[in-house]
Amino acid sequence: MNFQGKVVLITGAGSGIGKKAAVMFAERGAKVAINDISEEKGKETVELIKSMGGEAAFIFGDVAKDAEQIVKKTVETFGRLDILVNNAGIVPYGNIEETSEEDFDKTMAVNVKGPFLLSKYAVEQMKKQGGGVIVNVSSEAGLIGIPRRCVYSVSKAALLGLTRSLAVDYVDYGIRVNAVCPGTTQSEGLMARVKASPNPEELLKKMTSRIPMKRLGKEEEIAFAILFAACDEAGFMTGSIINIDGGSTAV
């Protein structure tokens, strides 16, 4: 996969899957706009890419509030926008009784409104250029029920609806839209939660027990799927949902 000359905007790229994807895009020639709500983490990703000889810039912004400015700044910095990766998201825990209206509003703002508006402004730019790609990072929770992930599941299912709708609406403009659905992934955030638990070994065992492969996913495995969904070699793929979950949604 070659992304030479492509400009990629990745939200939530200060850590985790977003950071890994940013590095992998840069390794393959892309210019990467790193968006994150944490200036410190976002700039760390930028410096990492630059240390490898790649090209990147930090674009500060809250996806729920600053979508138009995030896209505008990316285009001002690099002159165009070829690929948007809607990766930023939050993971609240709780069933419907444990979920407040405030929790619902915040989750939907970050996980749905943000990608919706970013896609809206990205599409406007991509139409001018003659095409582009949007990749939405959803979740296995958007496909199956997972205990105490109520509003998270709602938000990630909504992202799949957005993916299919955009794919149909903009196919004639050369814009492809796909989604990836990661399973439980060995990210910085998850492992911090495991280590902070009363019994880390038991929690990890519980997490992997429901996965047919009996292990957690790796950040690079999810990032690779994002790159594939965005690459020119996947030019006939749009409106597709890619599961990377060790078989969890197959049982």
From Swiss-Prot:
UniProt keywords, alphabetically: Oxidoreductase
Broad EC category: oxidoreductase
Protein name as catalogued: Uncharacterized oxidoreductase TM_0325
InterPro entries hit by this protein: NAD(P)-bd_dom_sf (IPR036291), Sc_DH/Rdtase_CS (IPR020904), SDR_fam (IPR002347), SDR_superfamily_enzyme (IPR051122)
Gene Ontology MF term list: oxidoreductase activity
Annotated residues for binding of substrate: S139
Family, similarity comment: Belongs to the short-chain dehydrogenases/reductases (SDR) family.
EC number: 1.-.-.-
Coiled-coil boundaries: none
One Pfam family matching this protein: adh_short_C2
Keyword rRNA processing: no
Active-site residues, Swiss-Prot/TrEMBL: Y152 (proton acceptor)
Gene3D superfamilies linked: NAD(P)-binding Rossmann-like Domain (3.40.50.720)
Chain residues that bind NADP(+): 10-34
